[in-house]
């Protein structure tokens, strides 16, 4: 198991916690109350800074219940915390619903998944190898 160092920037901040024994994502918590109007996006503070190990990234995902029941989900769909970022972890929550929503202090707002990744070298090419799919894009492989 890897260790992720966390600095509390606010005494009210709650360290990320897993909701179950096999959960992939640890819950992130709002440090203060924030109102998010219908169709609006607000930056929700966690009061935490993290030290993600080199070779890993922190991925911030929506909490399924919050998205389904209240229409609140990260505006960028997936947030990325790079290993060299040391600022406050914030979640840009967008209200997809028709009613104003209030995020309470201490409420779970997103999930943090820490995962390894590969860096690649991008190389310009005149041609790419042929495949059966070719340039077929959206919907090209069928619906079943």
Which residues fall in each region the model found?
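DUTPase catalytic domain/fold
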Residues: 1-144
């Amino acid at each position: 198991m890897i260790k992720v160092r966390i600095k509390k920037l606010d005494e009210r901040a709650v360290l990320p916690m897993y909701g179950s024994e096999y959960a992939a994502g640890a819950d992130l918590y709002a440090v203060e109350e924030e109102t998010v109007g219908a169709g609006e996006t607000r930056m929700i503070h966690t009061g935490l800074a993290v030290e993600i190990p080199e070779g890993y990234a922190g991925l911030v995902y929506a909490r399924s219940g919050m998205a389904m029941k209240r229409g609140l989900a990260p505006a960028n769909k997936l947030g990325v915390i790079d290993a060299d970022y040391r600022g406050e972890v914030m979640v840009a929550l967008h209200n997809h619903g028709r009613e104003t929503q209030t995020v309470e202090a201490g409420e779970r707002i997103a999930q943090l998944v820490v995962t390894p990744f590969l860096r690649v070298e991008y190389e310009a090419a005149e041609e790419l190898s042929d495949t059966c799919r070719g340039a077929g894009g959206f919907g090209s492989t069928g619906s079943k």
